Regions:
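A penicillin-recognizing enzyme superfamily signal
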Residues: 1-172, 177-178, 183
Length: 185
């Protein structure tokens, strides 16, 4: 997920950024290797889709009164078979955070989706930690940070146009999912 807020640039993990001597002088510094793996436009397209998870989908609890996060963020919930693992990965322009709830023994798992899905098990961890991050002014991460739309971005660059009133289309099977989901908020 780090390639999305970095607009398609992959940074190789780097454990040590510099080495100082006893006097505090930097004797060596290191920068991560980086390469473009996705165009800015495609990265922003993913950002836009993953923002919808927060604004309209399984991550929308972050917008509710419990967490009340109004920042420009994207994210993705995830649940493995038999509710053994719940995931939430969220990101803002300056930080990506992954939360996992699960265990090594695959036979031990939540009994139902009500508790075992990523939106119920891992997202609350993200919500609480994200509030603390925003409250800590020393980190340089604020709720006012926003994603920049690339100047060359076009949401319909494939030549396909959305259907008129596409947002109003709801299939009958979707209503049951939304009602069940709302019952937990």
């Amino acid at each position: 997920y780090t390639i999305f807020p970095s607009y398609g640039i992959h940074y190789s993990p780097l454990l040590v950024t510099h080495i100082e001597d006893a006097n505090g002088d930097i004797v060596a510094s290191f920068t991560p290797r980086m390469n473009e793996v996705l165009s800015k436009e495609k990265a922003y397209q993913m950002i836009d889709m993953l923002k919808a998870v927060i604004n309209e989908g399984t991550g929308r609890a972050l917008r509710g009164s419990k967490y009340n996060i109004r920042a420009d963020i994207g994210g993705k919930t995830g649940t493995t078979n038999s509710h053994a693992d719940g995931w939430f990965i969220g990101f803002c322009p300056k930080l990506v955070v992954a939360c996992w709830v699960g265990g090594e023994d695959r036979d031990i798992h939540f009994g139902t989706m009500a508790f075992g899905q990523g939106a119920r098990a891992a997202l609350p961890i993200y919500g609480k930690k994200k509030k603390k991050i925003y409250d800590n002014g020393n980190l340089g991460i604020t709720e006012k940070d926003t994603f920049d739309i690339p100047a060359t971005y076009s949401p319909c660059d494939d030549g396909l146009q959305a259907l008129p009133n596409a947002e109003d289309i709801l299939y009958p099977e979707d209503e049951n999912i939304l009602e069940a989901d709302d019952a937990f908020f």
